[in-house]
Every structure is written in C-alpha cells, then in structure tokens.
Amino acid sequence: MPKINTSSSGWLADISLFYERRGTNTKLVHREQVGPLMVQRPFYPETGVAHTYLLHPPGGVVGGDQLNINIHVSPQAHSLLTTPGATKFYRSSGAISSQTQNLTVESDGFLEWLPQENIFFPDSQAQLKTQVELHKDAHFIGWEMNCFGRPVLNEIFENGFVTGRTNIKVDDQLLLSESMYIDSIDEIKHAAGMRHYPMLGNLYIYPASEALEEKLRTLIDENFHEQPELFGSSNPICGITEIDGLLVIRYLGHQTEPMMACFSTLWQHTRQHWLGKLPEVPRIWAT
C-alpha cells in the first residue's frame, strides 16, 4: 500500500438534503450546502416523485477534495437523485480525495440513488464511503459504478489507489458491510473480485422478495444470454445474491453503456414490481 498524503488543500464540499411528503408530492423542504456541491430545483416528471440532479460544478475531483453528501427521506416521501454525468477523480501528486455519502430513509419512505459512474484516472488517490440507514418499511434502490482507468482510450489504471466501504443497515441492524481495495493494475488483474475487468458495479435493492428476485434473475439471463449483441465483445459478468432481505447485484465489465443499460433495466422493473408501473427515466441520461 503506497503512502498517502491525507492533508487537504482542495475543495471542501458538503450538502444535506431533506425530503418530506407534502400533499401528493415530495418536496425538498430543507437544504444545507458548503462549497461547490449543489442541486437543481427538483422537478416532477411523474406524480409524487421528486427528481433531483446533484451537481459538482468544477467538473471533477482532485487530490485533497472532500465531498460529503447527506440525503434524508422522511415518511412517505419519494425522491430520485442522479448526476448529469460521470464523477471524475483526477490524477493526484499524493493528496487523497474523498467522497462520503450518508443516505437515510424513514418508514414508508422511498429513495432511488442512481448516480452515473465514477471514473478513476491513473494515479488518482481516492476514498469512498457510503452509509445507508433504512427503516424496515422503507424502500431503497441504489447503485455505484466504478471505472478504473479509461478503457475506451486504452488507458489502464497502472498506478493509483482507491478504497471503498459500504454499510447498509435496517433498523440499526447491519445487513451488509463490504470494502473495496484497488491498488494499481495488479489488483485489477489478480483480485478475486475483479477478474481483469476495469469496471465494477453494485446495485442494492431493499426490500427483497422471492418474486422480485426471480424476476430480476430472469431479466439478467435474458439480457446476457438472449441479447448478447447488447454487450458487443465485452463479455461482462453479472450475478445476484440475497442477503437478509437485501438484493445485491454485481457487475463486471469493460464498458459503461452496457452496465448502465443493465442496471437501468433492473431498476425500472423493480419499480414496476413495487408500484405497478415503469418509472420515467431521467432525461439527463440520454444527453
């Protein structure tokens, strides 16, 4: 493990968003922000759901930057958050950048956490932390997509360092605690979890049910076995696991678009399973 300079001379960005149910809609009732993280005003392409775009104006994260994101969804509120593009972690001369996400959903609240991918440039130094706190009667679907290097440009993650920690709790009971440790291309080649793939995605869904799990397994089989043309020659791997009422879908691949297509399909059908209709896909994903 290389020596990391944890001193910070970069941006400190902190944002907290609080959503509440007001009548038939969900409202962003309170926000607190420091630094360049901000959101556009929520909009409502579908009744009752507050769609929100999370913006980081400088366009990327450099060594020493610290991003803290806090989302709180109150009872019966329903919010969907995404980003207008990839979050890019640029090369660092030694200072570590960090992104911490705290997501809280109360009873009968509904949070869809759907950011676009993280891209870690060679020589980037980054630390990711995600803490999800759910009430047992909450609904949550969230993903993270991480790209190490820029495979589309044949630029590999030869040097650099990325750590990650994700904890998911339901009623203060820890359901999932997992870590990620990537230290240069050797980790990608030899780590049991990466299998030479430069992209790793995780999709988390709560609550699980046998019917939903079977539906998503069928979708994965159909996408990977019956529509191989969608994935070209990238030969991705995707699997699903149920852990104490939480569904975890893992994806390994070489390209962003197939991973996004897979996760988006699973998200849409999960929403349909829960609410009886397909969601409105964020328009920003098509730009």
From Swiss-Prot:
Quote the subcellular location field of this record: Cytoplasm
One GO CC annotation: cytoplasm
What Pfam families does UniProt report for this protein, alphabetically?
A: UreD
What InterPro entries does the database record attribute to this sequence? UreD
Q: Which UniProt keywords apply?
A: Chaperone, Cytoplasm, Nickel insertion
**Primary localization:** cytoplasm
Q: Mind listing the GO molecular function terms for this protein?
A: nickel cation binding
**Which proteins does it associate with, and in what oligomeric form?**
UreD, UreF and UreG form a complex that acts as a GTP-hydrolysis-dependent molecular chaperone, activating the urease apoprotein by helping to assemble the nickel containing metallocenter of UreC. The UreE protein probably delivers the nickel.
Role according to the record: Required for maturation of urease via the functional incorporation of the urease nickel metallocenter.
Q: Which HAMAP family does this chain map to?
A: UreD
Give the family from UniProt.
Belongs to the UreD family.
PANTHER family in alphabetical order: UREASE ACCESSORY PROTEIN D
What is this protein's name? Urease accessory protein UreD
What organism is listed for this UniProt entry? Aliivibrio fischeri (strain MJ11)
- Classification of source organism: Bacteria, Pseudomonadati, Pseudomonadota, Gammaproteobacteria, Vibrionales
